[in-house]
């Protein structure tokens, strides 16, 4: 594995996965614009190394933004190699050890596992070559990105935020964006469900300042580990040690009693004072593709800034998918499937989180279906498990369905009995979900397709020779009538508060429509299928916006919702775009 971020950059360049940008490019908008275009190119394009940023540090972006680079960052040729290794490891570790010989055979496994645990070492690390303390600190030295026009300022977008539980001493490494407020303070955007926020609450109860250390760079496996859905109280650097097959070497921060990887590129040390009033942070063009709007978060005070002699500043750009984070999510699919089978649902055969679902809005699972109601069991279990609790729409198929095939899923969706297969619930949603009227809580919907015959006959959809506006709708699109029985509708330009899709279909003579989804034409009229799916998943709360009509048509209101209208969210953000 890699001894530094520069080591990884050398490997990227050797494999033709890196483009150097020698021209001067500003961290304010320009780096993000170039990176966004590259990330949306075929296969994720290339990693980008901006060598002239107007600061003393180069910036690398899109460094894990393809299947090949994501695998390379984790030290394998293909992500399935890690999944296979985890499956074999768990199988060996959990096999009952009845005899003495069985126990002796397990000793090599125990010896290997012991080599993954992080090691604390004395002295300073490479990350502490250059040191600025207290008044010497100037965060404006760092090429933090301002990505989108309405962003509240410049942000650290790949921070590994180290906190320690004041009661147990257990370390956590999370990834929470940080808005630069001035030379020595930032915001700390940890959501209420995150471990950092739980630690903050514990320090507040104890009446103590909370030490926080943020690192950037180093072996790219650290960055991945900080994003991974690890169980509470399990060290992210244990996962990193497993992935890189050797321990992470940790040194003590200079002004905080927290240990950090010695080979990182930057270290930002400081504290959060829970007795202080929270401050306004945001807006920020987020991974959902929308702005997350201004809200109150803690202020982070910086006491020291250190960096390597040859430091490279890592950054990511998030926005309308696909972006780099889609490939990070794909790695998580592969790596955590075996633990999901073990700890949550052994009948789960495969898991897919389509890029359009931005990790939380949409997931597809296949299961080994053996009894009635099993899909209900799986849905409720997944909605209560780790970060899957944020999932909003879930599709469940039988084990033989290739869930990444649009054709296979379309055949099931076209033929399923919607009156029988819908599983409705409500629960925790991502704080960034803007469609629900209550922040962090809303509707959930699963479709049980496990008993649907993909070869069953289907009735034709009857379309009108011409249609007229009705129910607040004026246009329709039939591109997916054949494969899905889906009619795409566009609301009137006046953006009425309510639309009546059932009235539009009835008055214009549509018959046999399985699904009808309405969008704002200005927002969605020229969108590709993937973007329409992204918009529909993001803009809807299943409780309010998904209705099964009396004649069996599933209608979905995917328009932007007008704040203040009964049942709508109090604020509705814009799409993050240049």
Q: What are these model-predicted stretches?
A:
Residues 1-283, 287-578:
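Extended, highly charged
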């Amino acid at each position: 594995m890699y001894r530094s971020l520069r080591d990884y950059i050398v490997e990227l360049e050797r494999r033709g996965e890196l483009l150097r940008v020698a021209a001067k490019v500003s961290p304010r908008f320009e780096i993000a614009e170039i990176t966004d275009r590259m990330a949306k190119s075929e296969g994720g394009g290339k990693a980008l190394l901006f060598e002239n940023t107007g600061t003393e540090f180069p910036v690398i972006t899109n460094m894990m933004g393809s299947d090949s680079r994501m695998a390379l960052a984790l030290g394998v040729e293909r992500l399935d190699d890690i999944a296979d290794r985890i499956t074999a490891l768990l199988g060996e570790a959990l096999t009952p050890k009845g005899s003495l010989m069985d126990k002796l055979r397990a000793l090599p496994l125990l010896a290997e596992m012991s080599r993954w645990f992080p090691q604390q070492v004395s002295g300073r690390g490479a990350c502490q070559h250059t040191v600025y303390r207290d008044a010497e600190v100037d965060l404006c030295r760092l090429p933090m990105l301002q990505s989108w026009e309405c962003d509240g300022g410049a942000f650290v977008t790949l921070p590994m935020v180290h906190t320690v539980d004041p009661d147990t001493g257990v370390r956590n490494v999370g990834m929470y964006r940080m808005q630069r407020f001035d030379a020595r303070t930032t915001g700390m955007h940890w959501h209420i469900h995150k471990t950092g926020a739980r630690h903050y609450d514990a320090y507040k109860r104890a009446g103590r300042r909370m030490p926080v250390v943020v690192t950037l760079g180093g072996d790219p496996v650290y960055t991945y580990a900080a994003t991974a859905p690890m169980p509470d109280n399990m060290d992210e650097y244990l996962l990193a040690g497993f992935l890189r097959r050797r321990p992470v070497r940790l040194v003590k921060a200079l002004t905080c009693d927290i240990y950090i990887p010695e080979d990182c590129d930057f270290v930002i040390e400081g504290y959060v004072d829970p007795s202080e009033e929270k401050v306004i942070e945001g807006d920020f063009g987020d991974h959902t593709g929308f702005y997350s709007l201004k809200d109150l978060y803690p202020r982070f005070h910086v006491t020291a800034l250190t960096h390597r002699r040859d430091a490279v500043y890592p950054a990511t750009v998030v926005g309308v998918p696909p972006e780099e984070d889609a490939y990070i999510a794909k790695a998580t699919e592969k790596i955590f499937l075996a633990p999901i089978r073990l700890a949550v649902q052994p009948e789960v055969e495969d898991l897919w989180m389509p890029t359009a679902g931005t990790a939380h809005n949409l997931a597809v699972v296949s299961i080994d279906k053996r009894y009635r109601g099993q899909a209900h069991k799986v849905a409720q279990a997944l909605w209560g498990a780790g970060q899957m609790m944020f999932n909003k729409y879930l599709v469940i198929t039988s084990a033989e369905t290739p869930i990444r095939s649009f054709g296979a899923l379309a055949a099931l969706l076209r033929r399923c009995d919607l009156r029988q297969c819908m599983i409705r619930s409500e629960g925790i949603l991502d704080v960034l979900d803007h469609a629900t009227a209550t922040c962090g809580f809303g509707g959930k919907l699963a479709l049980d397709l496990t008993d649907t015959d993909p070869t069953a006959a289907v009735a034709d959809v009857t379309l009108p020779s011409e249609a007229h506006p009705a129910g607040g709708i004026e246009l329709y699109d039939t591109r997916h009538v054949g494969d899905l029985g889906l009619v795409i509708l566009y609301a009137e330009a006046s953006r009425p508060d309510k639309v009546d899709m059932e009235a539009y279909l009835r008055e214009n003579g549509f018959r046999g429509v399985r699904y009808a989804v309405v969008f704002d034409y200005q927002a969605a009229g020229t969108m590709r299928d993937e973007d329409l799916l992204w918009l529909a998943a993001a803009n809807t709360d299943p409780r309010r916006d998904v209705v099964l009509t009396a004649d069996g048509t599933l209608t979905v209101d995917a328009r932007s919702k007008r704040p203040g209208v009964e049942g709508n969210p109090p604020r509705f953000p814009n799409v993050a775009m240049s």
